[in-house]
């Protein structure tokens, strides 16, 4: 499928319909990845009864655009994906991996049509994450010396690191539920990001720390536990919805109670 971002950037994706859907899931991939990164998650969500939209963020995969902002303008892409699926009148789940998780938080905070959020290895503040990436790539001393380079990138994209701070927006998601997943051996986005996000999230909120897993690796290392957490979260979310909002008879139809 093809659809425009909120600012007109052309986006490319895959639509995986369910004949009798429980809801619809929008899946957001990570930085320097594409929709294939979350295909495995989409397959599992499809098995759980969800129609799924996987798409490439701007400047990734087959989508248009030449510049990534690592979560800042990508929120416009996620909101456009929500626009795309909202026509079906089904409960909307946002799933995001790494950068996509941060984007999912900010998009859900700004759009009440999103009913629930699941993130995997999301950053709390882009500034914190960027500092970690510099040190991971160049070492602690050289990484700190190279940090000013990021300000050149911000100047070229006319953005600010403070434009991507899910920690400031996550509280707006409540009373809609959120599940935060993070590996305790994540060296790209340390687990402290998850604790910080959880602290600021409203109820209902769930934090699952995947013991021994690195960045977005929990679903590979321990898939049964991972998808068990996801399935339990989804069941609780849908069961808590008013009956008139959760009776479906087709891929885009709802019968009022």
Enumerate the predicted regions with their spans.
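N-terminal cap/lid segment of alpha/beta-hydrolase-fold proteins
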Residues: 1-20
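The serine-hydrolase catalytic nucleophile loop
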Residues: 31-44, 57
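Catalytic nucleophile-loop/oxyanion-hole region of alpha/beta-hydrolase
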Residues: 48, 60-91
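Hydrolase active-site cap/lid region
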Residues: 109-163, 168-171
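Short beta-strand/loop motif that positions the catalytic acidic residue
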Residues: 173-174, 179-182, 186
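Conserved alpha/beta-hydrolase "acid-adjacent" motif
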Residues: 187-193
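Catalytic histidine neighborhood in serine/cysteine hydrolases
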Residues: 198-216
């Amino acid at each position: 499928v093809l659809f425009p971002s909120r600012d007109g950037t052309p986006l490319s994706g895959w639509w995986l319909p369910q004949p009798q859907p429980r809801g619809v899931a929008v899946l957001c991939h990570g930085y320097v990845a594409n929709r294939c990164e979350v295909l495995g998650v989409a397959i599992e969500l499809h098995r759980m009864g969800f129609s799924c939209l996987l798409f490439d963020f701007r400047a990734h995969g087959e989508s248009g655009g030449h510049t990534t902002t690592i979560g800042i303008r990508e929120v416009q892409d996620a909101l456009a994906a929500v626009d795309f699926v909202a026509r079906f009148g089904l409960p909307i789940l946002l799933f995001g991996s790494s950068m996509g998780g941060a984007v999912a938080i900010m998009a859900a905070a700004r759009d009440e049509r999103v009913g629930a959020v699941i993130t995997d290895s999301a950053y709390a503040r882009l500034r914190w994450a960027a500092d970690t990436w510099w040190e991971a790539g160049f070492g602690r001393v050289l990484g700190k010396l190279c940090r000013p380079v990021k300000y050149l990138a911000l100047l070229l994209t006319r953005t600010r690191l403070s434009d991507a701070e899910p920690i400031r927006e996550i509280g707006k998601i409540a009373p809609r539920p959120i599940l935060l997943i993070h590996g305790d051996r994540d060296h790209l986005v340390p687990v402290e990001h998850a604790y910080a996000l959880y602290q600021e999230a409203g109820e209902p909120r769930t934090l699952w720390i995947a013991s021994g897993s690195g960045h977005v690796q929990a679903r590979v290392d321990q898939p049964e536990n991972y998808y068990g957490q996801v399935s339990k979260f989804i069941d609780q979310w849908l069961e808590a919805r008013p009956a008139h909002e959760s009776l479906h008879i087709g891929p885009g139809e709802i019968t009022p109670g």
